[in-house]
Amino acid sequence: MLYLSEVMMKNHDMSSFEELKQALKGEARQGQMFFEMDVKPQFDDTPTDWQDQCEAAFTSRD
């Protein structure tokens, strides 16, 4: 199980929500199958629908 907090710790130099979405896509491409959102991203550009966007980024893998 991949946790959002793990992705954020592994990529601690991220400065935007868009970078987080790219990191999630990368994790999915590497074979991660399950994803849990255990924290809310605290970026200035984090949208109100951040959970939907994180899920979409993880499942799209594009």
Language model features with spans:
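Metal-dependent phosphodiesterase/phospholipase catalytic core, i.e.
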Residues: 1-62
